[in-house]
């Protein structure tokens, strides 16, 4: 098979990148690419470790003059998001990608490219392969299944690592240094409720037309949470009309801002017009409040089929109080990085069925103690309402370091090479760096990478010139880490 990237510079980087594109390596299909990395290390006499998950660690001694320098972790992930167009003939279990070079970009015909994070692996292999690149002792870590929940990093044996400085090459915008990320957890609330026979009329209350979005990346857009709006309407109705709740539901994922929610109410037939007026008044309020962020919000109350069971009024009150009091939205902004959401909570899933209230909130914070504070508040509310909290899916924060020698050194290298100051950023979502920081006390870490466009889609492409500049930066960074 002829090589498509052989004329591109840096030759070693693009050589290894093309090798990787010939090995199927979608998430949960990483054995072959993991074995490739192990064979690479053994052929060069390097120390190598491979675990049952297919994570790989390769160690290389320091070059001359760097023997006394602290070791450095160079990290990326082996898996890619495997997506293709309907007409693509590629079989991701056995076929190589069909690479294309157009102008300044490398892409794959009809499929994702896997630049996220194949370019990190290719750069690390090129460093390991070279006898000319100056560097401290290296601990190269290739994790797996990052794209489906960072499963490889979650199961990594961190006792194999001694370094406390780390270069993560898993960012998609050149010139941006990511230096912090949120930790998170899912807060699962369960509250038992009491039902009783019911002979009242029923109405269906719906809140819809919202935009929704990702609860980490878009929590700062000011968009409404349908579950919270549902609670406000129920409270407004309850203040003037006696009703009993039959059921309620809103949201499908805890990490998505719900764009719709509904509830079935049991009430007297003669109260139906007044309840409809209250719903209309709430809609008017919401449209005013969210005119800029969520202008499509609608609230409707329509007749529904009769039911023979409903929550008691006391149980209904507990549900309404939960929706009014549960933490939601931005809890704190960062004092270190302007514009960064530091702590937030999103009630992504809410159900009342079979006399049980079930709610799942996504809790995020780049400060571990604040994440615990929010979980404690949800726990306290749950207990006050006769329920319980179960925390799942917890992952650690990568907390911002006000003093970071590594960040300072890398910024100096970047400025020296480009004449520009790197942009320092943090994200309100989880990264593998957070798992490393949680397991390696004192870790000083920076994430960077070349320009990748439309990752995780069949339009994905990687800038050749940006790879060249990022490679030059990586070499300069390794050279600068002499102390």
Region spans (language model):
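Zn-dependent metallopeptidase/amidohydrolase metal-coordination segment
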Residues: 13, 335, 342-357, 362, ...
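Fold-level recognition of mixed alpha/beta catalytic cores in primary-metabolism enzymes, strongest
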Residues: 136-226, 234, 238
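Active-site-adjacent substrate-binding region
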Residues: 223-248, 400-443
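A short beta-alpha structural unit
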Residues: 18-22, 264, 298-310, 348-350, ...
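A conserved active-site cap/scaffold subdomain adjacent to cofactor or substrate pockets
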Residues: 254-333
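His/Asp/Glu-rich mid-to-C-terminal helical/loop segments that flank catalytic regions of hydrolases
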Residues: 159, 223-240, 269-274, 318-324, ...
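Acidic/His- and Gly-rich active-site-bordering loop/insert found
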Residues: 3-105
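Active-site metal-coordination/substrate-binding segment of hydrolases
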Residues: 66-164, 186, 190, 199-202, ...
């Amino acid at each position: 098979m002829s090589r498509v990237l052989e004329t591109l510079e840096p030759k070693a980087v693009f050589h290894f990148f093309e090798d990787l594109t010939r090995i199927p390596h979608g998430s949960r299909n990483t054995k072959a690419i993991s074995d490739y990395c192990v064979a690479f290390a053994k052929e060069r006499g390097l120390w190598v470790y491979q675990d049952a998950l297919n994570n790989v660690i390769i160690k290389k001694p320091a070059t001359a003059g760097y023997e006394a320098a602290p070791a450095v972790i160079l990290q990326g992930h082996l898996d890619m998001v495997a997506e293709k167009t309907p007409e693509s003939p590629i079989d991701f279990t056995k076929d190589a990608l069909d690479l294309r070079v157009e102008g300044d970009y490398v892409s794959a015909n009809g499929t994702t490219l896997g630049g996220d994070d194949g370019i990190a692996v290719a750069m690390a292999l090129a460093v390991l392969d070279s006898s000319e690149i100056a560097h401290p002792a290296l601990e190269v870590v290739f994790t797996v299944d990052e794209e489906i929940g960072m499963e490889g990093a979650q199961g990594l044996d961190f006792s194999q690592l001694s370094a406390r400085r780390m270069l993560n090459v898993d960012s998609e915008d050149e010139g941006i240094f990511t230096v912090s990320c949120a930790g998170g957890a899912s807060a699962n609330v369960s509250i038992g409720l009491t039902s009783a026979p019911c002979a009242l009329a029923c109405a269906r209350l719906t809140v819809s037309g919202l935009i929704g979005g990702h609860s980490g990346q878009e929590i700062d857009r000011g968009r409404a949470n349908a579950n919270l709006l549902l609670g406000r309407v129920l409270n407004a109705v309850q203040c003037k009309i006696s009703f009993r709740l039959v059921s309620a539901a809103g949201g499908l994922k805890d990490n998505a801002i719900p764009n719709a929610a509904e509830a079935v109410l049991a009430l007297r037939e003669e109260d139906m017009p007044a309840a409809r007026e209250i719903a209309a008044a709430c809609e008017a309020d919401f449209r005013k409040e969210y005119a800029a962020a969520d202008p499509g919000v609608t609230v409707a109350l329509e007749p529904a089929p009769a039911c023979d069971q409903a929550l008691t009024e006391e149980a209904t009150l507990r549900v309404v109080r939960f929706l009014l009091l549960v933490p939601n939205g931005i809890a704190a902004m960062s004092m270190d990085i302007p514009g960064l959401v530091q702590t937030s909570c999103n009630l992504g899933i809410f159900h009342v069925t079979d006399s049980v209230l079930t709610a799942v909130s996504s809790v995020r914070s780049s400060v571990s103690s604040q994440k615990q504070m929010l979980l404690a508040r949800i726990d306290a509310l749950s207990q006050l309402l006769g329920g319980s909290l179960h925390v799942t899916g917890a992952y650690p924060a990568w907390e911002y370091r006000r003093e970071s020698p590594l960040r300072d050194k890398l910024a100096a290298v970047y400025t020296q090479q480009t004449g520009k100051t790197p942009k320092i950023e943090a994200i309100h979502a989880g990264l593998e760096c957070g798992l490393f920081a949680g397991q390696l006390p004192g870790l000083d870490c920076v994430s960077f990478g070349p320009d990748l466009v439309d990752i995780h889609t069949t339009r994905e492409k990687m800038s050749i010139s940006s790879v060249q500049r990022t490679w030059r930066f990586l070499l300069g960074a390794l050279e600068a880490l002499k102390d």
